[in-house]
Structure formats: structure tokens, C-alpha cells
Amino acid sequence: AGGFRWYRRATMQSLFHLAYHVTDLEQARKFYRDVLGCAEGRSTETWVDFNFFGHQISLHLGEPFPVTNTGRVGNHMVPMPHLGMVLLKPDWMALAERLKAANTQFVLEPQVRFEGEPGEQWTMFFRDPCGNPIEVKGFSSWEQVYEH
């Protein structure tokens, strides 16, 4: 399942590792593996690793961090803290379609932001089944990520 298991920038010299809590490992597995398309790595009965678009996330049983919509971006208040990923636009579009097909409830519907400006990007916010917010941004090229 999924078309994003291969996702990795050719120039990437390192990758990040992030560990956070989920309340149900099986629900989380289904979402990260079957909806997001992340390949599962090692696991025990209390945690599971995933290849999250070329980076490692570890989901551990526990209570997720409190989240509030306190991050202002343009006219929107977005969940803080949140996990985020940057993709190229074609991959972002494909993921948005996968999420819609899975009836994912969006915190912020897929949309373009800063249109026609440096750093133009597509963005969407959603939560995993345990309530952890995730933002995925899409750019036309890697060079646009840090434009100002």
C-alpha cells in the first residue's frame, strides 16, 4: 500500500527522528501505513517505527501532547505543536487525494497559500487517529522552500 515509501531527496545528507505518543498503536499503524503510505520498521508491543517520507518517526503508546490552535499563519490559526513534512507539488497533490479518498477530516483543507509570492506553497492540516496534528506542504521546487 502507498506510493510514498521511496520518498527521499537525492541530496539529503541526514534525516530526522521524532518520537511521540499515540493512544492506539493499531489505529496509528493503519493510518500511517495504509493512508499515508509509510513503510513500517521495527516495533514492540509499546512502539512502532515508520519511514515517514524518508525520515524516522517512532510512535509510542502514551498520552499525546496537548495541542491548541495558537499558530497564526495568514488568516488561519493552526495547531501547535505539529509534525510537518515538505513534499514536491505532484507528491503533495497525490497525498491530498489519498487523504480525501480515506475520508480524512482536515483541520485545514488542502489549499494554496502565498499565491504568486516567493515561497508559494500548498498546505493541508489533518490529525492522525490519536489526535496528533500533521501539516504537509507542497512546493513546485525545493528551491522555493526557503524563498523570501
Spans of features found by a protein language model:
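Short secondary-structure boundary/capping segments
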Residues: E40, V48-D49, R72-N75, E115-G116
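N-terminal beta-strand motif that seeds the catalytic metal site of vicinal oxygen chelate
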Residues: R5-E26, H82-L83, L87, G138-H148
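A generic structural signal for short beta-strands and their flanking turns/coil linkers
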Residues: S14-F16, T46, H55, P79-P81, ...
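Core segments of cupin and vicinal oxygen chelate
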Residues: Y20-P64
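A short local loop/turn or secondary-structure capping micro-motif enriched for an aromatic residue
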Residues: S58-L59, F65-N69, W142-V145
